[in-house]
């Protein structure tokens, strides 16, 4: 099985998560691509797509790339500088899945906490200290906490999630069964 991981990263969090997933995969062939450096030809059995969340979904570069993908087994993962168990995080992952689900088979998804880039923090600070897109004391505290993400545990969980889904795909293929739709 050949797995290609393609990611877009602003602060380095998505790159770190992609690298951790890549390192953990035990497959015949695997390739890791930074979308900013190279737009790969997708010839693998599985494509894992990682992005940083911008405006509630994939960043612009990944969004444009996702629009070109067709007929693939796809996994989607993302990082954001907010709580991974929040509705915002789930919606951000669902937005990425929605971009690929009609033309591809979705194997699964994963959303992870990440740090906010310094440029984004500067924009929030320019908005003052009141409101959701400001440098409120609560936001400042969250940004400080998120500096430690993704953690090794989060990376391991993402790697486990996709390793499990690849195993499931192979099990089904051996039995000539279709991968069931996943509603993310």
Model regions and ranges:
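Structured loop/turn residues at beta-strand edges in well-structured enzyme cores
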Residues: 1, 42, 104
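Conserved beta-strand termini and adjacent loop/short-helix elements that scaffold enzyme active sites
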Residues: 6, 32-35, 112
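Conserved beta-strand elements of the Class I
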Residues: 3-6, 47, 75
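Structural alpha-helical scaffold elements that stabilize or flank donor/cofactor-binding regions
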Residues: 40-41, 67
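A short, well-structured beta->alpha microelement
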Residues: 26-40
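Short acidic/histidine-rich motifs immediately flanking catalytic phosphotransfer sites
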Residues: 41-47
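FMN-binding flavodoxin-like domain, especially the glycine-rich phosphate-binding loop
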Residues: 24-28, 49, 54-184
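N-terminal beta1-alpha1 ligand-phosphate binding loop
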Residues: 2-24
């Amino acid at each position: 099985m050949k797995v290609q991981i393609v990611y877009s990263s602003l602060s380095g969090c998505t790159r770190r998560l992609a690298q951790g997933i890549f390192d953990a995969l035990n497959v015949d062939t695997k390739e890791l691509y930074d979308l900013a450096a190279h737009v790969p030809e997708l010839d693998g059995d599985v494509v894992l797509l990682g992005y940083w969340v911008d405006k509630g979904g994939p960043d612009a570069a990944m969004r444009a790339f996702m629009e070109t993908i067709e007929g693939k087994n796809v996994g989607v993962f993302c990082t954001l500088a907010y709580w991974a168990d929040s509705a915002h995080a789930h919606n951000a992952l669902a937005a990425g899945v929605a971009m690929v689900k009609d033309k591809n088979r979705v194997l699964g998804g994963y959303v992870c906490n990440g740090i906010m880039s310094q440029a984004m923090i500067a924009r929030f600070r320019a908005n003052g200290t009141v409101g959701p897109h400001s440098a409120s004391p609560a936001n400042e505290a969250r940004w400080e906490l998120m500096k430690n993400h993704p953690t090794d545990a989060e990376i391991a969980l993402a790697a486990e999630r996709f390793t499990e889904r690849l195993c499931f795909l192979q099990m089904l293929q051996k039995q000539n069964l279709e991968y069931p739709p996943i509603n993310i």
